[in-house]
Amino acid sequence: MEILGYKVRYVKLDNPESKKTLVLLHGLGASAERWAELWPLLKKYNVIIPDLVGFGYSEKPLVEYTIDFFVRFLKDFFEKMQIRNPVVMGSSFGGQLALEFSLIYRDFFEKIILISPAGTLERPTYVLSQYIFAGLYPTIENVHSAFQMMANTKEYVVDDTTVKDYVNRMRLPNAKYSLISTLLAMRKNHTLRNRLVEISIPTLVIWGRNDTTIPVENIEYFKRMPIVQTLIMEGCGHTPYVEKPAEFYQMIEKFIDS
């Protein structure tokens, strides 16, 4: 599929009996596969998971990856896919992008689920810096170390398939460029926290207690939103849907179906 003139890859999980459409937005440097642990649990819904332009196996043009560029990408994607009033779930940068989109298209989403959303940090944390380093120098050792730090729990061990997939993707042409360009755009938009009060869409915010990539203290900013629930998952780091998918699903199912 072409979005904004660029080839975009996406995963679609259909359920003809469901009236709910979920759109999952991955984080910085990730792909649709980052949600793979959750796929079997979401079978009661229609689920659409794009590789954002510049990431995964979508095209990686040499453009400036601004927040506005990603918002236009999403709008075109929704129109081409004929998606209306979805529940959008965004992890980290994907969460920030969902919020930025909502500030422009205020009634487009039915509900929003945010997992450790970006948009509030003034500067990268040590763990985030290590993740960026692993993206720029994608060896098995660097990536495994960064992913394990992001989980920040001994109970979860990063699997080799995830590591190898990330290494392979970050070695694709222009992958490092899009990573850095997007990171710069994220840093310019850390004032998102001051506009959260403007978003009146029902929102669920989930954070891992052990998250040191975007520390759990940042959840306080999101309590300013008019219609919001906030939950903290114990024993999880930056990606609770990867680390404890069954427990995570129990948290989101009630919110989605209510």
Name each model feature, range by range.
Residues 1-22, 43-46, 83-84, 256-258:
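Alpha/beta-hydrolase fold catalytic core
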Residues 99, 103, 109-139:
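Flexible "cap/lid" loop of the alpha/beta hydrolase fold
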Residues 204-236, 242:
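Conserved loop-alpha-helix segment in the C-terminal half of the alpha/beta-hydrolase fold
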Residues 242-254:
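Post-His helix in hydrolase/transferase enzymes
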